[in-house]
Amino acid sequence: MVRLEKKDPLMLARQLPLKSVALILAGGRGTRLKDLTATRAKPAVHFGGKFRIIDFALSNCINSGIRRIGVITQYQSHTLVQHIQRGWSFFSEEMNEFVDLLPAQQRVHGETWYRGTADAVTQNLDIIRRYKAEYVVILAGDHIYKQDYSRMLIDHVEKGARCTVACLPVPVAEARAFGVMAVDENSKVIDFVEKPANPPSMPCDDTKALASMGIYIFDADYLYELLEEDDENESSSHDFGKDIIPKVTYSGEAYAHPFPLSCVQSDPNAEPYWRDVGTLEAYWKANLDLASVTPELDMYDQDWPIRTHMESLPPAKFVQDRSGSHGMTLNSLVSGGCIISGSVVVQSVLFPRVRVNSFCNIDSAVLLPDVWVGRSCRLRRCIIDRACVIPEGMVIGENAEEDARRFYRSEEGIVLVTRDMLARLSA
């Protein structure tokens, strides 16, 4: 591929996204979220009071100037597809802008679905080639972060890389869940191990390991060549982290891109924000952090908005019930269509159309859309799934044994409540 001559960074920031296509891998099940992903893919899980997890990757693309996007789906895709069709249909076909939905179709390899993340792209190569992009940006659809991909594209081009991997230091104890890399003084990746049992630490800090974020930029022709070779390799697991990136590393073609260089944040002195909300505790904690006085993730940055499907809902309402009890909230996010009647909500996140009846106390809870809470309930350190009806007088989050018997209780004490669990109680 012909390299661009050295140009002004602002010019490159405008040009490179137009030469790129983003592919969002959104077919993951998210098994560590337990029953929260029983009926939806992890990227379709609600987050932050009104969003879905995939909205962050999609918004990053739009804000970075990338308006050619493919979303690769597989597991429980209906909710995700519906959300994208309703909330992300504003692209201009005349301007060659689009969000293409690329579901698993069992088009090759007999009856198999996608065999891995790399195979998910391989099975759609005929479509992807038609985009005629010079650069392909591979993204995971299940992380919470704000990143300017145009800055990473500039880094990719200026280094003369054929593959660039976004990376971030993480505690060694957490690095087992990531691909871990080593780099030289020129940011070339010299070693890469996917999810090692004993992650190697960084030379400059033995408490941290340099982790891959699952965000890659490839020269398009180089990526197609790699995927075609991988497809013919019967011993491959057809995964970017396990197969493609190690191969690129050992051929000397991979470079690292430090996430702080392209992370978008209001406070330049703050730690770069990136979360894998793949466990119930991580999901619960990341939601509640948004309700704090100074959240780590700034959702109010008008220069980098997070977009989503906007429903026509009335404002949230806090009312006094007939007994004189006031509906009150503190340090919480309360979305449109919610009604809090004579109850107290503290340090919680309420998604649209939640109804909390009188004499309730809700503390450190995440209530997904359409939850109905009966009178005199107490909810603490819990996640209530969509459309659950909490019976009058129910107490959740105060008795560990009772919570574990009736619902799912994590080792950290976070209680997940779903409609099926409630139905079993009344059976």
From Swiss-Prot:
Disulfide topology: none
UniProt binding sites for AMP: 40, 46, 52, 130, 386
Function: Involved in the biosynthesis of ADP-glucose, a building block required for the elongation reactions to produce glycogen. Catalyzes the reaction between ATP and alpha-D-glucose 1-phosphate (G1P) to produce pyrophosphate and ADP-Glc.
Biological process per Gene Ontology, one example term: glycogen biosynthetic process
Enzyme Commission code(s) on record: 2.7.7.27
This protein's name: Glucose-1-phosphate adenylyltransferase
UniProt organism field: Cronobacter sakazakii (strain ATCC BAA-894) (Enterobacter sakazakii)
Gene Ontology MF terms: ATP binding; glucose-1-phosphate adenylyltransferase activity
Annotated pathway: Glycan biosynthesis; glycogen biosynthesis
SUPFAM superfamilies per record: Nucleotide-diphospho-sugar transferases, Trimeric LpxA-like enzymes
Keyword tags: Allosteric enzyme, ATP-binding, Carbohydrate metabolism, Glycogen biosynthesis, Glycogen metabolism, Nucleotide-binding, Nucleotidyltransferase, Transferase
